[in-house]
Amino acid sequence: MDFSAYQNLWVFIETDDGKAASVGLELLHPGVELAHQLGQKAVAVILGKDNTEAEKAAIAYGADQVISVEDPAYEYYNTEAYTYGMTKLVEKYQPSILMIGATIIGRDFGPRLSCRLKTGLTADCTSLAVDAETGIMGWTRPAFGGNLMATIMCENTRPQMGTVRPGVFKKTAPDNTRTAEVIKESIPVPADVIRTTLIESIREAAAEMVKLEDAEIIVSGGRGLGKAENFSYIRDLADALGGAVGASRAAVDAGWIPHVHQVGQTGKTVAPKLYIACGISGAIQHQAGMSGSDCIVAINKDPDAPIFSIADYGIVGDLFQVLPVMTAEVKKLKS
């Protein structure tokens, strides 16, 4: 089939209160590289009520062009409204590739949009590659419970769509001196399209929010903790450091901590400045979710644990003795 009319790589920039969410800016990093390999543009696409800040951020993080749709209907994410607006844009501009963050919103938006466009979608990707000759994208994602990595291609329809996990790619350093074309589109949403309405938005208390993808410090616990109650050791150190609490799949499968804390191929992919792995053996599935961390500290009583092979610093010892000392020292330094 001839897809020569389909050009450019689009990155959907999710917003919150008019500000660009981190995942969209992360995706501009590979998006720009892949688009330029094809000799095409990396286009940031934004739907919202007031996109001024998000437009500036997208340009600073590398977008060659921005398509911005502003309307009160897009102030908050709405499945029907966003699908309607993006469908109109895709039909008009015909992008070859469309990348969406695999957030709660992206996991709802991506499948519905791909269905509307009658094209394929690869979900929860952790790696991307493109064939410069054919323009075909290779979307790689975990399969069979994270035991295999599958690369999926969409050869017969366009656009090629995929959702990509937050934290897989790091944002480039922003360049606030960059300029790029901003195309303003007006796409009002017909009343009969909207079947659901946001009545009230309630934000969780900051202390209860788990933002592993945005955390600069993560303290994670694994099977070595032995039971749910022992996650208090992890929380104490995380609180002292001002970090977030993570966990291995083994700890989550044991029911010691909710899945939202899981790091790894079947959990979240993170890249904090500091990652402390406590009682985690370091299976390849876990490493895939945190190996991009700037500094990795491993604490395990088994000197042959695989986690030590990727750790910058290793402590061979009993975590129940090590963690209280670390927590006390951190508190002492802070005081």
Residue ranges and their predicted role:
Residues 1-335:
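N-terminal glycine-rich FAD/FM-binding segment characteristic of electron-transfer flavoproteins
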